[in-house]
Amino acid sequence: MDRAQLRGMGVALITPFDEKGEVDHESLRLLADYQVAGGADYIVALGTTGESPTIEEAERSAILQTVREAVAGRCPIIVGAGGNYTERLVNRIQAMDKTGVDAILSVAPYYNKPTQEGIYRHYRTLAESTDTSIILYNVPGRTGVNIKSETTLRLATDCPNIIGIKEASGNVDQVRAIVLEKPDPFIVLSGDDHLSLSFIKEGAEGVISVIGNAYPELFSRLIHLCLENRFEEAETIQQRLEGMCYLMFVDGNPAGIKELLYQKGLIRHNILRLPLVSASDSTSTLIARVRNQIEQR
């Protein structure tokens, strides 16, 4: 994958379900098209926001096929594939139909809490097992481990097909440390919508966004203004969206974004798979209120 294609806004696509809890491929197709038409620079399917832990292997293949058909070559597609048993993950990636897949977003090994050396060996083994580009995903709030900047830099230097990192540690100092010492082609992306402006000021080159599902045109505009160093204009958009960005996580992700998409009529059903549940009534009311404020301006 051309690393320059990661600059800008990628959308962490939700996985819509129907009233029976099955994948709603029609809503998925329409939503993927909505992202591309709205200015998303690339699509990320089957990540955290896509409820990947609850998706069966056969469903993954069908979801990817639907996304491929909807995108129709108009932008890159990145697919989430992570795990905490390296050998199993290697086998899974090797068996995956990667037709039309430009890169893999792979979350740090979770729950068993490896050391930094274990994290390094895990990702190096993945990188050596495939020619597909790999993007590291650091989200310690979910995994229980932080990929320290030193480990990221080792991987960026030692593994040519590890092309970037989605940084969702919330740690601006860590982002700064990576940016200062990384090899030139390695790309740093924000994993938090509300920190994107701050991260880009430190040298990050984009975001993998949740709020972009609902407002691709508006949030893409914010990100590209930041990349053009037009931060005052970007801050105006950020202030407009910051309340909604907060609400997306009050009841966990993707409960918030699915509620918003349902209210906007972009998905037909507001269904999550257990143990995740839909946003509470109070959160839904707040989302409706803030949505009205955003869309009236």
Curated annotation (Swiss-Prot):
List GO molecular-function terms, semicolon-separated: 4-hydroxy-tetrahydrodipicolinate synthase activity
Write out the annotated subcellular location: Cytoplasm
Which pathway does this chain act in?
Answer: Amino-acid biosynthesis; L-lysine biosynthesis via DAP pathway; (S)-tetrahydrodipicolinate from L-aspartate: step 3/4
What is the main EC category here? lyase
* Listed InterPro entries: Aldolase_TIM, DapA, DapA-like, Schiff_base-form_aldolases_AS
- BP terms from Gene Ontology: diaminopimelate biosynthetic process; lysine biosynthetic process via diaminopimelate
Which SMART domains does the UniProt entry name for this protein? DHDPS (SM01130)
Can you tell me which residues form the catalytic site?
Y137, K166
The UniProt site entry described as Part of a proton relay during catalysis is assigned to T48, Y111
Give the Enzyme Commission number. 4.3.3.7
Family annotation (SUPFAM superfamilies): Aldolase
Q: Name one Pfam family in it.
A: DHDPS
- Residues the entry annotates as binding pyruvate: T49, I208
GO CC terms for this protein? cytosol
Q: Which reaction does it catalyse?
A: L-aspartate 4-semialdehyde + pyruvate = (2S,4S)-4-hydroxy-2,3,4,5-tetrahydrodipicolinate + H2O + H(+)
Write out the similarity annotation: Belongs to the DapA family.
Describe, as the record does, how this protein assembles with itself and its partners. Answer: Homotetramer; dimer of dimers.
Q: What is this protein for, i.e. what is its function?
A: Catalyzes the condensation of (S)-aspartate-beta-semialdehyde [(S)-ASA] and pyruvate to 4-hydroxy-tetrahydrodipicolinate (HTPA).
- The name this protein carries in UniProt is 4-hydroxy-tetrahydrodipicolinate synthase
